[in-house]
Amino acid sequence: MKPFQGITFCPTAINNEILAKKISKKIIKLGGIFSKDLTRQVNVLVVGSTTNTNKFKFAVKHRFDIIFIDIQAIDDIYQLWLSGENILPDSNTATMTGSTYEMLKILYRRFSFKYLHNFNIFIGRITDTNITSIDSLVRSIKKLGCSSYNYQNFVIKDTSSHNDDDDQGQNGQISIFVTDTLLGARVNAAIEQNIPIVHFKWILDCQKRSALLPYDPYYLLPNIKDLPYDSIGSNSCDCWDKINTTFPTNIDAQSSLQRQQSSSTLTPSLPKTSSLLNKFKPKGEKIWDKAMSLQQHSKTNFSVLGQSPLSINNKQEDLSDNSTLIFKNCAFIIHHIFPGNHRSILTKIVVQNGGKIETSYLSGIYDHSYYIIPSNKALDSFNDLPEIIDDNDGIVTEFFIERCLYYQKLLHPIDLWSKPFLSTIEFQVSSSSKLLHHEFSSSPFLNVTITGFSGVELLHLTKVLNLLKPMGINYVEYLNKSTDILLINLAALPSIPKTHPLWSNEFSDLFTQFCINNNNDDPGDNNRKDFQNNSILRNSMKRKIEYIKKFHSIPVVTPAFIFKLLSAASGENNEIFLNNIKWCIICPRGHKDDFKCKIKKPYYTSISSEKKYQNNDPKIDKTILLKRNNSSLSEHSMKDTKNELLQKIRETDSGRKKRSVSSSIMDVSSERQMPDTKRIKLESLPKNFVPKQIKRTTSWGTIMSENVPTEQPTAISNPEEIPRTEEVSHTQVTYGSIQDKKRTASLEKPMRRQTRNQTKELDS
């Protein structure tokens, strides 16, 4: 049975159509009915951005049987349902009163709308102390969601005028002055600032009605100063006599809801408890709630040691109920890199469960000693971690504390969930192009979806995947055509025998504890059987597997692939194949390289660790550095290696200096000296030597002439006939002297030179 079965929801002040569609889809998936109109069948009114709507005002005045919740409540319940939490009421209680009625009670007690969240309330003088007091009013407005209040000094945070509650539509704070007298300097100052003076009975009536009543005109002190106390605000609601102070449903409505469930099959869920509210939180929160035992109210959140504060709500569940202490005779060293509030939380958890907090690692004194570091910090960022040799001790993350609290026992030996998994963050995952679905998603990241997980494993796996997004692995909540890999819980597949290679490898402890607790035959132990008792999780996993087999063929692997990838990021082997039998359950057909994921490191991390010693000279002998990195050296050999390395560097530096000096000398000498080749001595020409005339084939004046001779004489007919002395002695082409040209011109017939103008006439 779904949690909202038989409950009708109606929205108000949700102007965003996209948001309204999302809310309606979630309500329908949870088994509820979504109605845009406020009809008689409506049980819950979902309030959006403001309470200044006709639906809200009508429901407050006339509908005593309606529960008011906000949008966030729908989102929180939907996330709980997806994660496999038991949000249905207890089976024994539901049998007597009806499951729908009990679900409405949970909505009323846990998720009622905090309608004073945008109010700035100043509490002045209270003359009638027999009815209430300032401390009592402060407690009341805090329960109603008001966080901005003052009863000592009159400080105006919102100087704008507030004549009525219509200003709620502006999403601004509403300032009011609560008192029962019009006398006093503070009251006069509030009147000058146009701040409404409201009788304190308005707060008490809002708490009784479980809704925001209009203070204008029913509670404005100038209007009702002469009225008796019982008559104040009597007209603000028409159903005072029908309101139940514990739950807004009368006997007739309760009977009607019971009849709706008469033919329904109720699902056993939570064990009987005096508080249904505390059972409505995710496992991660309930672990810390039990441990901390604080009285603090907060919204549902999956974070345990994350960014948001812890949500603690009930004092009745405490670790005093446990007969044994989880961390008895265990010592913990909390690294100083943890934030102060996280350190205090871890310290209190460890001490309350029998553990000891030490400042340094002590081996052999306690049964177990653990050094705790943050899960989101890489190991290569630490330089002060101790060297732990004892098998009973180890370096763990805060995941270890959470897992021990979740399973209510000390988990030994330490599994892969609890060990530091992030060795470095300086790497990128490059996947095969055939593995990525670029036609549906342009992202170069590897899109990963999970199924079959619940409880603390679900919490930790999502945290691990979110940490890997900068490295190229993108966690997506839903399975679709853009998904590249499906991570599945091996312990949720009972058809795979324990002798299979999926179980007989170094990653098997990822699923051992989950398998032990969900396969426990004890019928009374239902607290950890989230997957076994939740048909929604099992059906969801089956549907995802069927979808992959029929419509979207992608690899289905266990989280061992992720942990292998993380371990390979610090090693030399930088290629991981998805079709490995250690983690692959379903794999499409294809070549081995089609399922390859390559780990790429930056240059300064991909080269060996000897980079810190090298001086970028390629002639340095690196064998010493490689030996030092690849072998464990004694103290004596390390000194020898150091001296040998320094000697090599000195020799290289001196050799480089000699080469640089010699090269500079050669450069200077080469500039000053002439080439070493002998100059050829030019022979003097005889006095009566007359050079031959060289006839040019054409010139600028004869280029466009038609009388240019077609047969062009060759200046040199045979190169071999030129004397050697003439070839050597001349350095440029000689065209003859002026006298030779005159003598030649007198012997030949003069040729008339064609000009450009004559050429144009010929063309015409």
From Swiss-Prot:
It is found in: Nucleus. GO terms for molecular function: DNA polymerase binding; protein kinase activator activity. Residues 739-751 have a biased composition (Basic and acidic residues). GO terms for cellular component: DNA replication preinitiation complex; nucleus; replication fork. InterPro entries: BRCT_dom, BRCT_dom_sf. Residues 651-675, 710-764 are annotated as: Disordered. Residues 1-99, 129-220, 322-418 form the BRCT domain. Its main location: nucleus. GO terms for biological process: DNA replication checkpoint signaling; DNA replication initiation; double-strand break repair via break-induced replication; mating type switching; mitotic DNA replication checkpoint signaling; mitotic G2 DNA damage checkpoint signaling; recombinational repair; regulation of mitotic DNA replication initiation. Pfam families: BRCT (PF00533), BRCT_2 (PF16589). Keywords: Cell cycle, DNA replication, Nucleus, Repeat. Present with 540 molecules/cell in log phase SD medium. Interacts with SLD2. Has a role in the initiation of DNA replication. Required at S-phase checkpoint. Required for the association of PSF1 with origins. Also required for the proper activation of RAD53 in response to DNA damage and replication blocks. Multicopy suppressor of DPB2 mutation. Overexpression restores the growth defect conferred by POL2 mutation. PANTHER family: DNA REPLICATION REGULATOR DPB11-RELATED (PTHR13561), DNA TOPOISOMERASE 2-BINDING PROTEIN 1 (PTHR13561:SF20). This is DNA replication regulator DPB11. The lineage of its organism: Eukaryota, Fungi, Dikarya, Ascomycota, Saccharomycotina.
